[in-house]
Amino acid sequence: TSILSQGGCIDSFGVGERMITAKTDPVFGAVYKICAVEENGKFAPRIKVSETVEKITNPGLKSVYRVYDEEGHAVADLITGFDEKVDFSTPYRYVDPEKPWKNRSYENCTAKPLLHKVIEGGKRLTKTKTLQELQAYVKKQLDNEIWEEEQRFENPHKHYIDMSPDYYEMKMSMLHNIRTV
């Protein structure tokens, strides 16, 4: 990556299992797993447990919000239960799953939902965007929302993924119940 920024020539980039993770730390936390199962017309949360924290799934139906500071920069993504109400008009308490003992809150922030229904009953609900529209959307996010520190290739700043207190408690309860079985 620093080769590119220094003007080096690259003929191609490869993608593969051994190429996206280090052999000594083969963890990629963006794998799709079952998070809920429909039982009697309702969705029951499911969780996959692993010795590697990044591989433990986030159970149940959920909503995900991108949280913005006063300047419009994304400060974190917030996972909540699907029907959970989020109010940012006052300081909003959240849980950092990596440091759950800390008492933290978003203040003077706004949020927008990241998950949108695109298909229902086999029918597409939204118009397909052109390649140019998608490129413009991503460019706008990179230019205006995502911190430069998160975009650098070497030692990037981590984008935070936080949880609502209720969602975090549900996840911890499921993990506790698995440990006691």
Label each region the model flagged.
Residues 2-181:
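Gly/Ser/Thr/Ala-enriched C-terminal appendages of enzymes
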